C-alpha cells in the first residue's frame, strides 16, 4: 500500500481493522510498530493508515462499512474460510478486491468485484499450528505486484468500479443470507 501510493497527491488512506491475537494494549502497540516499520522502509511520502484495533459490535461495523469515506474493501486473505466481513461489505454495493481463493469465491461475484490473482504456497513453519495449520499445508498468496496495480487502477477510475459493484448489494440480499 505504501509503495503503491507513495508521493501521490490525494492518495487514498487505509483503514486497517486487525489484531494479532488479543485486543490488548500490548497487541495494539506491536501492530503500530509493524506499520511504522513498513512506513520507514519506503522512500517518500506515504499515505495515511488508520488502525482500528478491538472488537466492534454489528452496528459499529455497519457504520464503518457504510461510511461515505469508506470506498472499498481490500483483503489479501490466505484462505481462512467463509469470510463474513467480505459478505457484509459486499452488501454495501461498494467494490471488494479480494484473493481469488477460499469460501468467499462462492459469493464474491466477479461481475461486481475483483478477485485478485495469486497462487497456493506452502505455509511457513512459523505460521504452523499443530492440529490447525499443519506441516505440508498451503495457503493462497496474492500476487502483490498485480494487486498493487489493480488497487491503483480502482483508485484512478473509482467511479467505473463503484458503478460496477453497485448491483452487489441486491445480489447479496437476494442470493445469500447473513
Mark where each language-model region is.
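Short alpha-helical segment that forms part of, or immediately flanks, the ligand-binding pocket
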Residues: 62, 87-95, 102-106
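Short hydrophobic beta-strand element within catalytic cores of glycosyltransferases
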Residues: 95-98, 114-115
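A short alpha->beta transition loop at the rim of the catalytic pocket in nucleotide-sugar-dependent
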Residues: 69-71, 93, 100
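Nucleotide-activated donor-binding/catalytic signature segment of Leloir-type glycosyltransferases, i.e.
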Residues: 22-67, 71
